[in-house]
């Protein structure tokens, strides 16, 4: 059976009170509609068609290469939205799944089971349903004695006995593709909203003698639709729990999973420990046997094996195996920390390479620089890389020593085995085995204390 997917993503979402197109609001680092499309792609459909409207260009950019797109110029209901895909799907044989782009929690497993059930039962239409703890506000699924779906009753229209039903419509449907397009031509807009409803297709098919069934999924929470910021927060909470539990099943330890925020595309190796209050975002990859402590934030970075990150921020950077950083340090974009290097507290590195086994202990800024291996950088060292107009680069060779409080004014080259005395301001190259001293000589003024002025109530002692 060929599979097709239609994603409805044309609504504006006024209840979100936002300038951002609703389905582009993120849940754990991915737009809601991208979660939906990625789940659909996992069932390997022959086509995915996304119906776009408001913010179409932005949606197409997010889903580039993952879907075809059709514009719905006027938003005239769910049935009207599906009709826009006629040119892409109407001539095809198979089954079509219809899902909205603001339901980010549906899994590929649920879609796969819906397709399979639809095919096994020989249905013309299959409604994805769930048992709701509190079904108020949802459309209720009314079945006949054989379990076939008779109708979907909305809250405002239901009789008392119908409203006792807890099986609800999730808004996801699977149709025989040919039956769908025949029925859509019969859907009218004779209702208070003047819209074309996709749910009318079910009644049209049933009256035509076609079989309409329902597949009840076990997890009601998957069906959460996001229409406001409260629902967005709830979807994020559920997705975060799902992500963290997945990592834990793969061998990652979470000290307090409820407070660890991990984006959907993050990868973490086994035997790594994530403490509470950690944020890991984007396409970050973390190796095995690492420790990420409270207060750390890692974005779009690669962390090797055996790395310790202590209450630090890492952005678009690489830390190789057996390195450590922190507390309270910051890797800015394009920092490369090579194997065995140590960065202590209050160290900032930007667009710089720190070589193997090099130590940068504390209170240091390294920007636009390449440091070799086995270097010791003392406390309070500054790589002065900016003249107010341009950035300049400095290179420090292997096994060099940079004394505390020194400033290296770029661009300069410090050779292998060079020494820079503490509190020096270095403006010229330093050769191999040389020691550079660039500071004023110390002068001790004898009896200077006695030359200081006294207040009226003081005397020299």
Swiss-Prot record:
Function, in words: Catalyzes the last two sequential reactions in the de novo biosynthetic pathway for UDP-N-acetylglucosamine (UDP-GlcNAc). The C-terminal domain catalyzes the transfer of acetyl group from acetyl coenzyme A to glucosamine-1-phosphate (GlcN-1-P) to produce N-acetylglucosamine-1-phosphate (GlcNAc-1-P), which is converted into UDP-GlcNAc by the transfer of uridine 5-monophosphate (from uridine 5-triphosphate), a reaction catalyzed by the N-terminal domain.
Record region (N-acetyltransferase): 251-461
Listed pathway(s): Nucleotide-sugar biosynthesis; UDP-N-acetyl-alpha-D-glucosamine biosynthesis; N-acetyl-alpha-D-glucosamine 1-phosphate from alpha-D-glucosamine 6-phosphate (route II): step 2/2; Nucleotide-sugar biosynthesis; UDP-N-acetyl-alpha-D-glucosamine biosynthesis; UDP-N-acetyl-alpha-D-glucosamine from N-acetyl-alpha-D-glucosamine 1-phosphate: step 1/1; Bacterial outer membrane biogenesis; LPS lipid A biosynthesis
Compartmental location: Cytoplasm
Catalytic activity: alpha-D-glucosamine 1-phosphate + acetyl-CoA = N-acetyl-alpha-D-glucosamine 1-phosphate + CoA + H(+); N-acetyl-alpha-D-glucosamine 1-phosphate + UTP + H(+) = UDP-N-acetyl-alpha-D-glucosamine + diphosphate
Recorded name of the encoding gene: glmU
Native species: Lactobacillus delbrueckii subsp. bulgaricus (strain ATCC BAA-365 / Lb-18)
Listed EC numbers: 2.7.7.23, 2.3.1.157
Family under the similarity heading: In the N-terminal section; belongs to the N-acetylglucosamine-1-phosphate uridyltransferase family. In the C-terminal section; belongs to the transferase hexapeptide repeat family.
Protein name: Bifunctional protein GlmU
Active-site residues, Swiss-Prot/TrEMBL: 362 (proton acceptor)
Residue ranges of the region described as Linker: 230-250
GO terms of biological process kind: cell morphogenesis; cell wall organization; lipid A biosynthetic process; peptidoglycan biosynthetic process; regulation of cell shape; UDP-N-acetylglucosamine biosynthetic process
Upper lineage: Bacteria, Bacillati, Bacillota, Bacilli, Lactobacillales
Gene3D superfamilies per the UniProt record, alphabetical: Hexapeptide repeat proteins, Spore Coat Polysaccharide Biosynthesis Protein SpsA, Chain A
Binding site for Mg(2+): 102, 227
The keyword Metal-binding belongs to this UniProt entry's keyword annotation: yes
């Amino acid at each position: 059976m060929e599979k097709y997917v239609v994603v409805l993503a044309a609504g504006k979402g006024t209840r979100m009170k936002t300038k951002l197109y609703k389905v582009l609001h993120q849940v754990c680092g991915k737009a809601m509609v991208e979660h939906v499309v990625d789940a659909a792609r996992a069932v390997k459909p022959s086509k995915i068609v996304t119906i776009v409207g408001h913010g179409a260009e932005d949606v197409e950019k997010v889903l580039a290469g993952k879907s075809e797109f059709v514009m719905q110029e006027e938003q005239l209901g769910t049935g009207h939205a599906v009709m826009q895909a006629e040119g892409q799907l109407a001539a095809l044989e198979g089954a079509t799944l219809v899902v909205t782009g603001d339901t980010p929690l549906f899994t590929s497993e649920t879609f796969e089971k819906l397709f399979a059930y639809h095919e096994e039962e020989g249905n013309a239409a299959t409604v994805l349903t769930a048992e709701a703890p509190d079904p108020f506000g949802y459309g209720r699924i009314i079945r006949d004695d054989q379990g076939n779906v008779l109708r979907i009753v909305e809250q405002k229209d239901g009789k008392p006995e119908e409203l006792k039903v807890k099986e609800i419509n999730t808004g996801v449907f699977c149709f025989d593709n040919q039956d769908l397009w025949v029925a859509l031509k019969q859907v009218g807009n004779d209702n208070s909203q003047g819209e074309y409803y996709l749910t009318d297709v079910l009644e049209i098919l049933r009256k035509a003698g076609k079989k309409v069934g329902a597949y009840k999924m076990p997890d009601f929470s998957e069906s959460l639709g996001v229409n406001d910021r409260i629902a967005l927060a709830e979807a994020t909470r559920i997705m975060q729990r799902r992500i963290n539990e997945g990592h834990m099943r793969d061998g990652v330890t979470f000290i307090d999973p409820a407070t660890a925020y991990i984006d959907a595309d993050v990868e973490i190796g086994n035997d790594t420990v994530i403490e509470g209050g950690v944020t890991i975002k984007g396409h970050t990859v973390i190796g095995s046997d690492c420790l990420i402590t409270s207060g750390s934030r890692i974005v779009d970075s690669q962390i090797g094996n055996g790395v310790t990150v202590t209450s630090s921020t890492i952005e678009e950077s690489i830390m190789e195996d057996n390195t450590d950083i922190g507390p309270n340090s910051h890797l800015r974009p394009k920092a490369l920390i090579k194997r065995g290097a140590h960065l202590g507290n209050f160290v900032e590195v930007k667009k710089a390479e720190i070589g193997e086994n090099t130590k940068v202990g504390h209170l240091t800024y390294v920007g636009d620089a390449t440091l070799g291996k086995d270097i010791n950088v003392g406390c309070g060292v500054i790589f002065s890389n900016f003249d107010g107009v341009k950035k300049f680069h400095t290179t420090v060779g292997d096994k060099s020593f940079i004394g505390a409080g020194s400033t290296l004014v770029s661009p300069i080259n410090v050779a292998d085995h060079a020494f820079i005395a503490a509190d020096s301001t270095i403006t010229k190259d330093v050769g191999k085995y040389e020691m550079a001293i660039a500071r004023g000589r110390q002068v001790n003024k004898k009896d200077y204390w006695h030359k200081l002025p006294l207040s009226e109530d003081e005397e020299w002692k």
